[in-house]
Design a protein with these regions (language model features):
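Conserved C-terminal structural/oligomerization subdomain of aldehyde/semialdehyde dehydrogenase
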Residues: 1, 104, 153-264
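Short, small-residue-biased leader/transition segments that mark boundaries at the very start
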Residues: 2-7
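ALDH superfamily catalytic-core signature
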Residues: 16-173, 196, 200
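Alpha-helix/helix-capping structural signal
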Residues: 15-16, 87, 219, 241
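Periplasmic-binding protein-like
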Residues: 8-12
Length: 264
C-alpha cells in the first residue's frame, strides 16, 4: 500500500479484512483516506399489518427468495435478516421454503437452472463455516445440505451451496445473527412481537446498505422511515401499488447517497 499522492483507498470485502487494512502502518503513517464497504446485514421487515392472504405477503416472500438466490446470494445488498411478525412466522417459513425448493441449482447455461455456483471453493468453505456459526443460535428451516441435486455436466466439483434458510427464535437476545454474514444464498428469519421490536431488530445490524419494509398501510411506513433512515443507505418501501414499478430490494440507485454502477 503506497502513498500514490494520498489518493483515497476504497475496499469492498469482509469486515475482518477491512479492519486489518484500516490500521495498516502505511495508511496510518501517511494519513491516506481509507473507505471500506464491509459486511452488511441488510434486513427486510414484513409489517404486522400484513396477513398471509395479502398481496404484500407474497411480495415479501418473493423479495427474500430473490435476494437469496440472485448471484447465489453474493451481493452486498442481499437480505440476510428477514424480520417477520411472530404470529405469521410459520406461514412465512413455509412459503419461503416452498419457493426455495423449486430453485434449480447447477450450470446456469442449462435451461431451467436458476442459481449457479459461488465464486470459489474457498468461498464455499467460508459460507459453510459461517452457517455453522449461525446455527449455534439459529435452527435450520431448509437447505444446508452439502450433498444436494445439481443440474449440468461437470458440476460435481463446483463451488455450489444449497439455498439455506435459518430461524432465530429469540433475535432480541442473540448477537451472532446480527453480526455474522454468510456471503452466499443464506438468510435468517427473525420473529418480532410488535413494530417497536421490529425496528429495534433492524437497528441491530449496526448500519446496513439497504433495508426493506413491506406494508399495506402508509401510516406504518410513516412511522418506520424516520426511525430507520439513519441506519440504512436506502429504505425500500413496497406494497401492491408500487410493486409494478419497484426496482426491488437489491437494485442499485446511483442518484442516492449509496449505490450505482461499480458500487453496491
Amino acid at each position: 500500500l503506497s502513498l500514490h499522492d494520498a489518493l483515497p483507498i476504497s475496499f469492498t470485502g469482509s469486515a475482518d479484512t477491512a479492519a486489518k487494512l484500516r490500521v495498516n502502518a502505511n495508511i496510518v503513517r501517511n494519513s491516506i483516506p481509507f473507505n471500506a464497504e464491509a459486511d452488511s446485514l441488510n434486513c427486510a421487515i414484513l409489517a404486522d399489518d400484513v396477513s398471509p392472504d395479502d398481496e404484500e405477503f407474497d411480495l415479501f416472500v418473493k423479495e427474500v427468495v430473490r435476494e437469496m438466490t440472485v448471484k447465489a446470494g453474493q451481493k452486498c445488498t442481499a437480505i440476510r435478516r428477514a424480520i417477520v411478525p411472530r404470529k405469521h412466522l410459520d406461514a412465512v417459513a413455509e412459503k419461503i421454503k416452498a419457493r426455495l425448493s423449486k430453485v434449480v441449482v447447477g450450470d446456469p447455461s442449462v435451461e431451467g437452472v436458476k442459481m449457479g455456483a459461488l465464486a470459489s471453493k474457498s468461498q464455499q468453505s467460508d459460507v459453510a463455516e459461517r452457517v455453522a456459526m449461525l446455527r449455534q443460535s439459529a435452527e435450520l428451516v431448509c437447505g444446508g445440505d452439502a450433498h444436494f441435486s445439481l443440474v449440468g455436466e461437470g458440476v460435481a466439483q463446483g463451488a455450489f451451496f444449497q439455498p439455506t434458510l435459518l430461524l432465530c427464535q429469540q433475535p432480541m437476545n442473540t448477537d451472532s445473527v446480527h453480526d455474522i454474514e454468510a456471503f452466499g444464498p443464506v438468510s435468517t428469519l427473525m420473529p418480532y412481537d410488535n413494530m417497536e421490536e421490529a425496528m429495534a431488530l433492524a437497528k441491530r445490524g449496526k448500519g446496513s446498505l439497504v433495508g426493506s419494509l413491506i406494508t399495506k398501510t402508509p401510516e406504518v411506513a410513516a412511522q418506520v422511515v424516520p426511525r430507520l433512515a439513519a441506519n440504512h443507505g436506502r429504505l425500500h418501501i413496497l406494497d401492491r401499488e408500487s410493486a409494478g414499478e419497484s426496482t426491488g430490494h437489491g437494485s442499485p440507485l446511483p442518484s442516492l447517497k449509496h449505490g450505482g454502477p461499480g458500487r453496491a
